[in-house]
Design a protein with these regions (language model features):
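An intracellular "coupling" helix at the cytosolic face of ABC transporter transmembrane type-1 domains
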Residues: 23-27, 140-153, 213, 226, ...
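Transmembrane helix-loop-helix hairpins at lipid-water interfaces of multipass membrane proteins
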Residues: 31-94, 164, 168-201, 279-300
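ABC-fold ATPase nucleotide-binding domain signature/coupling loops
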Residues: 136, 379, 483-515, 521-536, ...
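Cytosolic ends of transmembrane helices, especially the final helix of ABC transmembrane type-1 domains
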Residues: 239, 305-341, 471
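Helix-to-loop junction immediately C-terminal to a conserved catalytic motif
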Residues: 412
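ABC ATPase nucleotide-binding domain helical subdomain, centered on the C-loop/LSGGQ "ABC signature"
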Residues: 421-423, 456-502, 558
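C-terminal portion of ABC ATPase nucleotide-binding domains
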Residues: 550, 558, 567-619
Length: 619
């Protein structure tokens, strides 16, 4: 019983919280939508009263004749009933439109909250957590139905006003016109069925929620079938049938258990409560018929009571305009609240207020840093100690999987070390506000983003505050060797870098890399003091990559520069080179020192050089 009370209390509190979202829809709109719902709740009762009045007046009007006042009264009652019917039909489109507007405005606000919460965490680890991904999928799952969202939940709750009003007012009129025991019996019977249906919907929604990971896998297959990025491989390797089978299989895995559970969760409560409703409604109807036969009520009262019983009984049903919308919308809103809470707790960990504006002045240090992706995962970095002097260039080399990119992610505070710390000029990097520290970093990763936006934004995103400064954007493009490329595009800086848009252009892998490098150099224009290139030139051949790095080091002389590469021959001009292997530094020094050492660097350098000499591309 205590668990039931807690469940009901939580559901009520959630409903109240989601109703507060109506504030973002605007008082006038919500007031208008509520007025339409009040009319929708009262109009059917008024129509029943009017038609019952027509039925009650027919005998006397027929007896009195066509020219009698009784006949005129019958006509007036008939006109009133017709007018009420027409008004009900005319009000429906406005009622629907008001609900849609409420939905759109609330969902717009929810999308803004999702976006804001997504940027709350300092790093990206929270966005890779399975629980977080399930919550985000719950907030906005395009396959769940016809737009079941917090906005539809708000509109659905407003529509409940008319349903409950019909049930209450019709019950009261039955009590006034006929008998209170009859009103109570019919109202309670309908309420019993309604409670059974609604509780079943709630339990079914909770059961369906447990299939979040399955739905995410289904959606992944769907995206592979429809995405531009995967289209070439999907067709070349003939993956369409396989993906279609997997998509359908995962879709069935997500819905078949729900279909089977529906009989037990929804239909069983309905089957148990329906006999109660049938018994109470049947006894009431028999009582009304006997009263009419004995002259206890008039013909008009009989007509109203019978129609009233039907109207009250309709309350004991599934509400197509609100039940699924409210249930899934509330679950989506609950997921949003949990996501916001987790994001806020991540943000709360950042309490630093140190000024990062001129850092680093002396250097950056990794002190005994250990990190792995996920609890219990094998460490990618193990007890890493590394010093990066300010104003110098450092190359980090190693085979794929050595932990090079992870090192950069920790430096950018996309993740936090599991042990050890990173310091800037002797200050723990966590003492700097994350946004302020990142403004001092210009980092381009190997999987940099290809924005389907104009060249101006693709470069200018390196320093958003300079997006309107075309001179600096041109300067960054020139230094990256990409200005000639941009000058050949149809709209130059305004050309959208995607063939999916009119006058858009598709770049090759090497061309995209030069645009990305210009983005990093733009960050320098915006005040970045640390520049990181994480193999953004992997699509270039060895000679082009080596030439670029030499030119790049000249351009960035005086900056703290970190170059990541698995090609040992391309970074020889760096002031210092460290060799990373299985998450630990095994060698460091200049190119010449490492060759004289004759260790791992020298071995892999000569191995890659020999492959290059024989015409093979070094890995």
């Amino acid at each position: 019983m205590r668990r039931l009370r807690e469940y009901l209390r939580e559901r009520l509190e959630l409903r109240l919280r989601i109703l507060r979202l109506l504030r973002v829809a605007g008082l006038r709109l919500v007031g208008g939508a509520l007025a339409f719902q009040l009319f929708a709740g009262l109009a059917p009762v008024a129509f029943i009263l009017a038609t019952s009045s027509v039925v009650g007046r027919v005998p006397t009007a027929v007896e009195a004749g066509l020219d009698s006042p009784q006949w005129q009264s019958l006509q007036n009652a008939l006109l009133l009933a017709g007018a009420l019917f027409v008004l009900q039909q005319l009000s429906w489109p406005f009622q629907w439109a008001a609900g849609e507007l409420v939905t759109w405005r609330v969902d717009d606000a929810v999308r803004e909250r999702v976006a804001a919460a997504s940027f709350e965490p300092v790093g990206v680890g929270a966005l890779e957590d399975q629980q977080t991904l399930d919550e985000l999928a719950e907030i906005a799952d395009p396959q769940r139905g016809l737009g079941l969202s917090p906005g539809t939940a708000c509109a659905g709750m407003l529509s409940l006003v008319s349903r409950y009003l019909q049930w209450l007012v019709a019950s009261v009129f039955i009590g006034v016109v006929y008998a209170w025991w009859a009103a109570l019996a019919v109202a309670l019977g309908a309420l019993a069925v309604r409670v059974g249906i609604r509780s079943g919907v709630g339990r079914l929604g909770a059961f369906e929620e447990s299939f979040g990971p399955t739905r995410r896998r289904r959606d992944y297959y769907r995206d592979l079938l429809t995405s531009h990025d995967a289209a070439k491989e999907v067709r070349i390797f003939g993956l369409l049938p396989w993906l279609q089978d997997r998509y359908l299989a995962r879709g069935l895995d997500a819905v078949q258990p729900v279909w089977r559970a529906r009989r037990r969760i929804v239909y069983l409560p309905y089957a148990l409560s329906t006999p109660v409703w049938l018994l109470l409604s049947g006894l009431t109807t028999i009582g009304v018929a006997r009263a009419a036969a004995g002259g206890g009520i008039t013909l008009g009262e009989l007509a109203f009571t019978l129609q009233g019983i039907v109207l009250v009984s309709s309350f004991g049903s599934f509400f197509f305009e609100s039940d699924w919308q409210t249930e899934h919308g509330m679950r989506a809103f609950g997921a949003l609240e949990r996501f916001e809470s987790r994001a806020a707790s991540e943000r709360a960990r950042e309490s630093g207020a140190e000024d990062a504006a001129t850092r680093p002045r002396f250097g950056i240090r990794f002190e005994n840093v250990t990190f792995g992706y996920g609890d219990g995962a094998r460490p990618v970095l193990r007890g890493l100690d590394l010093e990066i002097p300010a104003g110098r260039s450092l190359a980090v080399v190693g085979l794929n999987g050595a932990g090079k990119t992870t090192l950069v992610k920790l430096l950018a505070r996309l993740y936090e070390p599991q042990s050890g710390r990173i310091t800037v000029d002797g200050i723990d990097v966590r003492e700097f506000p994350a946004a302020a520290w990142r403004r001092r970093l210009g980092a381009i990763f190997q999987d940099f983003v290809h924005y389907e936006l104009p060249v101006r934004e693709n470069v200018g995103f390196g320093a958003p505050s300079l997006l309107g400064d075309d001179a600096r954007i041109h300067s960054a493009l020139t230094r990256a060797g990409a200005l000639d490329l941009v000058e050949q595009l149809p709209q130059r800086l305004d050309t959208i870098l995607s063939r999916e848009y009119e006058d858009g252009a598709e770049l090759s892998g090497g061309q995209w890399q030069r645009v990305a490098i210009a983005r990093a150099l733009m960050a320098v224009e915006g005040g970045a003091g640390v520049l990181v290139l994480d193999e953004p030139t992997a699509n270039l051949d060895v000679r082009a990559e080596a030439a670029f790095f030499e030119s790049f080091l000249e351009l960035t002389r005086g900056l703290t520069t970190i170059l990541i590469s698995h090609r040992f021959s391309t970074v020889r001009r760096a002031d210092r080179i460290v060799v990373l292997d299985e998450g630990a530094i095994i060698e460091q020094g200049t190119h010449e020192e490492l060759l004289r050492l004759g260790g791992r660097y020298a071995e892999l350098f000569h191995f890659q050089a020999s492959r290059f000499a024989t015409g093979e591309e070094p890995e």
